[in-house]
């Protein structure tokens, strides 16, 4: 009998910069890989070309204080979603690194950002990971940069 365990985990670095480019806040946070996210990985490995689900392409931020759960399928209070600025696959460490930036007026009002997720569509879609964190107060002129690492081990 084969007995191999494949675990997925993730962590992200969030940096908030003011309109002047000065660093206002920086955090390192862990996340939950969702059940739908794990199913997405399995489908990417085993589906025929026409049925392969879309690649992860978006990151979203929101304002809910609801803790993450593997059964989550969306952010609870999404405020903005942006296309990933980069996706890097590391051959040596079984990691994928996703990056996104939420610039001025993204979202278009000041918010206390408390949650984030990675998705494979610009609306709805499969959520690979979700995290909740203490509030990061993003003003309309601020830029929020998120670098999210997901590892299979």
Predicted regions and their residues:
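Small cysteine-rich, disulfide-bonded extracellular modules of the LU/uPAR three-finger superfamily
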Residues: 1-114, 121-153
């Amino acid at each position: 009998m084969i007995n191999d365990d494949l675990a997925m985990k993730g962590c992200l670095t969030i940096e908030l910069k003011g309109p002047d480019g000065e660093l206002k806040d920086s955090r390192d946070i862990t996340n939950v890989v969702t059940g739908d996210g794990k199913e997405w990985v399995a489908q990417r490995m085993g589906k025929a070309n026409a049925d392969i689900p879309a690649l992860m392409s978006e990151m979203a931020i929101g304002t809910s204080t609801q803790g993450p759960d593997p059964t989550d399928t969306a952010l609870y209070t999404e405020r903005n979603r942006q296309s990933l600025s980069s996706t890097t696959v590391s051959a040596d460490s079984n990691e994928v690194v996703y990056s996104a930036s939420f610039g001025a007026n993204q979202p278009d009002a000041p918010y206390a950002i408390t949650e984030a997720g990675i998705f494979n569509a610009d609306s709805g879609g499969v959520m690979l990971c979700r995290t909740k964190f203490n509030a990061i107060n993003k003003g309309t002129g601020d830029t929020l940069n998120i670098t999210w690492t997901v590892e299979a081990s």
